[in-house]
Amino acid sequence: MKIQRFSLWVLLCVVFSLTGCGYNTMQQAEERVFKAWGDVEATLQRRADLIPNLVETVKGYASHERETLEAVINARAKATSVKLTADDLSDPAALERLQQAQGQISSSLSRLLVVAEQYPDLKANENFRDLQNQLEGTENRINVARQRFNQAAEEFNSMIRSFPNSVTNSMLLHLKRKEYIKADEAAKAVPKVKF
């Protein structure tokens, strides 16, 4: 009887010590994912904030390029209307919606910059060059923020799936795997170069 009681006591101690393994670490890892996502959102917002100034500058020189300008404005409006919560980071469809909206911004900005190439006075405008440089820098920041988010998500996902953290997670936390930011379909296509 004493041996059974002792064995039960030892078993309970082992179970409770295992479930405590990684409890705080997993929560800290999830917070790193949320912080990394906040950085992605901040850089996307920076790009969205640059667009009105860029459009206004181009409009002064290329007012008859109305269709291109409206495409940029509409893409910006759509992208800023797509909001993700912390729970959405585990939802592949929600992340896909955001990525599609951001892809439309990138595409319309590319068309706008192609239009700008047709106007030498616009290209020579110091304000336009400054905005273009800021936009390029922001695109680089977006890429870095996405990479950092994916790294934080990978560390978190690995942590919640490995033993004994998986036991702790399934018994106490019920944290869900975070999705990765993936390249959009257009970026996956290999460009054809013809001379």
Which residue ranges define each predicted feature?
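A helix-centric hydrophobic-segment signal that preferentially recognizes long
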Residues: 2-195
